[in-house]
Curated annotation (Swiss-Prot):
This protein's name: Protein-glutamate methylesterase/protein-glutamine glutaminase
InterPro entries from the UniProt entry: CheB-like (IPR008248), CheB_C (IPR035909), CheY-like_superfamily (IPR011006), Sig_transdc_resp-reg_Me-estase (IPR000673), Sig_transdc_resp-reg_receiver (IPR001789)
SUPFAM superfamilies: CheY-like, Methylesterase CheB, C-terminal domain
Enzyme Commission code: 3.1.1.61, 3.5.1.44
Modified residues (4-aspartylphosphate): 56
Amino acid sequence: MSKIRVLCVDDSALMRQIMTEIINSHPDMEVVATAPDPLVARDLIKKFNPQVLTLDVEMPRMDGLDFLEKLMRLRPMPVVMVSSLTGKGSEITLRALELGAIDFVTKPQLGIREGMLAYSELIAEKIRMAAKARLPQRSTTAEPTKIIQHMPLLSSEKLIAIGASTGGTEAIRHVLQPLPPTSPALLITQHMPPGFTKSFAERLNKLCQITVKEAEDGERVLPGHAYIAPGARHLELARSGANYQVRLNDGPPVNRHRPSVDVLFRSVAQYAGRNAVGVILTGMGNDGAAGMLELHQAGAYTLAQNEASCVVFGMPREAIAMGGVDEVVDLHQVSQRMLAQISAGQALRI
């Protein structure tokens, strides 16, 4: 079996060395070349035709974002960003995902070598996934998002739960942007490390008609609001009297993830049941599949993103295979379908 060919681009000689060491330690991949900046990388891409690029976010001569934008326009290929755990780093990384990067890994703030080596399996997993991923389709013209109209005011009992992983930041944006302010509350788990979820929520809040925020423990769940699970904390739905409430916990990872989609879906099945719609979007692995089955069995209507519009079809595929999905839809139909089901209650249940 041929190895996955990787080009590493980083202005730090130490990082290039560490990434090479990590990647070459896995038998199914190899670093074919390294570059200290995007201008050198441009020539090496032509020479070595790599399958995956790892790209530092902040570099001299041409920064990672400028290079990524040009690359995705002229020679689209799977890119895994390497980002710092800073506010600026998270903002740039989210912009990179918007431009078409498949995923990202974070540099530890202290003990670079030890920290990166500890991420060896995760880095290898992201490279394997990137090599097989479907590149996000970038629109050539920026069309304004059409807000869904004629959404009646609904009972505060109505709720939407969304789970996503790889490719999910852009998928979630596509789902939330058309929603009117009268939408029901949304609880969202996106696999993402601490330090990124707050920036992600703030970015979405600027783009959407609804209010988008990082979830806080104990706050009341309100219509017209979307609550994003904080990195490294499970997000659950709870009740306080007649109202829904956010619960955050630091329990062990589920399906290797914290936050976990299964944890969210199971709590929504318990407390919202047939008042809920569950949505599983693009992502690697099986997190959310068992929880979606519980949602389905509790009477919720369940949607999965179709393979053609997923960056990675892993999570939707597993949910479909378990029998917990009512309807499989293209990403551009998700917003309309979930609101239609919320409005119709169980009348349109398949």
